[in-house]
């Protein structure tokens, strides 16, 4: 009976102890192992925080810098939300104590570059969100140590360059979002090692050039979004190099140059059973001027007619020229034969006289 009487007191004391470790401006809930410090005016990381906290929300504050080993007292964190702050710098090893961290959200901040030590100690991370920052270059060292990452969102930055092997250690990555950046070309080696990638979003860039073998390593790709870029032409083998069971490709809102070559490419792609051009009916022509605004599917059967007619005209012209040459040669041959015959006759007459 005494134990039953003492137990509530112990629980109450434990709760008070937990709350005592909760910083001002935060709401700490022991049962859920979470601390909510969102939507405040925090300029520095709050302290203290319960050491058993697994979910920490610091979003929508005024944080500008994440120092070295910033979360040393909350090593058990699994989810860390730092989105919608003013963060412009992250020290090397800032997240290194968080060996159980699964989700890190740094979206909508002011981060311009990822240092060599940015990912130190984050081998357990499964989801990294860096959308709407100010990144311009992804270096080969940017994402080291992220061997178990499944989802990476880099959309709506200002990325113009992705170095070869920037994603080199991400053999488990399944979703990569690079949409809304400033990429102009995709070179071979950019997606090396992404054998598990299922979704690749590249929409809303300035891509006008794609190397033929750039998608070859993506042996699990199910969705490729290239809509809203600057593609005028595409090589058939660029997509043929995708050897997945089924890949859906989005290509609308590109300034296509509609000609016989383009028609042939899409006709061939349409015959490949594992490739699905989901928005083919929405593709429109930007060039030549007389086809501007027309849907490709409305004119695709006519694009090669002019070329065919031209080829026929050239062929007929060549045939006529050859026949005419043969006829002329034959006439000349006969003319020479008659002339020779007349000359021989004249010679015989002169001898007789």
Predicted regions and their residues:
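Consensus "Asn ladder" position of solenoid repeat domains
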Residues: 40, 61, 85, 106-109, ...
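Recurring C-terminal helix/loop segment of individual leucine-rich repeat
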Residues: 44-48, 68-72, 92-96, 116-120, ...
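Leucine-rich repeat
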Residues: 29, 43, 49-52, 64, 72-76, 87-88, 96-101, 112, ...
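LRR N-terminal entry segment and analogous cap-like coil->beta motifs
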Residues: 30-79, 83-86
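Eukaryotic tandem repeat interaction scaffolds
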Residues: 140-230
